[in-house]
A protein has these predicted regions:
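Conserved hydrophobic residues forming the short capping helix/wall of the S-adenosyl-L-methionine
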Residues: 63
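Secondary-structure junction motif
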Residues: 53-59
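Pocket-lining segment of extracytoplasmic ligand-binding domains
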Residues: 2-4, 33, 69-167
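Periplasmic-binding protein-like
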Residues: 179-187
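Hydrophobic residues within well-ordered alpha-helices
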Residues: 41, 87-88, 174
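Short amphipathic alpha-helical coupling segments at ligand-binding clamshell hinges
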Residues: 167-177
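Short helix-capping segments at alpha-helix termini
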Residues: 9, 66-71
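Short, glycine-/small- and polar/acidic-enriched structural segments
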Residues: 1-43, 47-50, 117
Length: 187
């Protein structure tokens, strides 16, 4: 979404160097809230991320793809740590998190509370990807958080960017070191 960054204008001096890990869009729900699908969020108290954060912008786009708005839920603007705490304390029913797979905070929540993962799939996911092509299809494998089955979702890729004035030999050396056997072993 360009809207939150419109005032700053295009960053035409940046160049993509390579893709890093994907940031998976995860919708967590307390199991006792009976939320199995996105539509089940209607009327529930939902943590959508801090205002204008990446998580919150993702949440707005995903609501839109499902034909819903924040008016359909009781929104709490919480960063994901706050949202997890609110879920632990029974103060919200669901939370949106954008992170790499295996997030320690999500794992910890799963140890202390019974949680479910809400899928982002079907036509809604296809609408999301069509309108915002920086999203990709993704899956949260069952083994990641000990769920009964994989959860379909969407993700965005983290990308290392550099100023276009950075000399090509510096970029080459960086990539050579990162993707060398030693570099890969280190990361």
């Amino acid at each position: 979404g360009a809207a939150p960054f419109a005032a700053e204008g295009a960053m035409s001096d940046l160049r993509a160097v390579f893709s890093l890990q994907s940031e998976v869009f995860t919708i967590l729900a307390r199991r006792d809230a009976n939320i199995a699908s996105f539509d089940d969020l209607k009327g529930k108290r939902v943590g959508v991320g801090a205002p204008n954060s990446g998580v919150e912008i993702n949440a707005r786009m995903i609501f839109e793809a499902h034909g819903m708005t924040y008016k359909d839920v009781k929104v709490d603007y919480l960063n994901y740590g706050e949202a997890i705490d609110q879920m632990k304390n029974g103060l919200i029913n669901a939370a949106f998190v954008t992170s790499g797979l295996g997030n320690a905070t999500i794992r910890e929540l799963g140890v202390t509370k019974k949680i479910a993962f809400v899928p982002v799939d079907g036509e809604a996911r296809q609408r999301l990807i069509k309108k915002y092509p920086f999203y990709i299809e993704s899956t949260i494998p069952a083994a990641t958080y000990g769920t009964a089955s994989d959860t379909p979702t969407a993700a965005v890729m983290n990308i290392l960017v550099a100023d276009k004035k950075l000399p090509a030999d510096v970029v080459y050396d960086l990539l050579k070191n990162i993707f060398s056997p030693t570099g890969l072993e280190t990361i």
